Amino acid sequence: MELQYDIDSIEVYDDFFEESTRDQIFKYLQRPKWSLNGGRDDNRFWHMNGLEKEEYFSSYLFKKISKKMNGKIKKYTITRIYANGQTAGQCGVPHPDDGDFTILYYPNPEWDIEWQGHLMFVDLDWNPDKVVAYKPNRMVCFPAKTVHYADAPSRHFNGLRISLAYKLTAPKND
């Protein structure tokens, strides 16, 4: 797998959805579908899989995302949609994603900078190079082969740090 790193290709959108949509997304992600099967065998975290099978995420929300991104992803195909959840001390591991393009959305309605849990991007020498703070209603988009990980929330945070992930495949050139 060829990794890539272009700091300028990382896009951050704040206040992405209107409040009612943000609240609805968070409500959907409060359902009892979470399981402790995300990550690797030696580093488990909370995971809600199979959201690409739900019309709300795969059609309704994806159309809203595409429109807000001026159609940039309109012709992309959804490979997977899922949510990751981390509690205090559950740190992600640096990794690239499958597919061509990754969208991460942060639905938690509130977040304090002291709770940490930021998104870390790693350069081609595997050194942390860019930090994107976890912030409610923020969307982060980047090429899938960009190495990244979610830092652990601090011990001062007693909830679940949620990220909603869309894995997309680019259209084939004819």
Please give the residue ranges for each predicted region.
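Non-heme Fe(II)/2-oxoglutarate
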Residues: 1-79, 86
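Catalytic core of non-heme Fe(II) oxygenases with the double-stranded beta-helix
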Residues: 59, 63-174
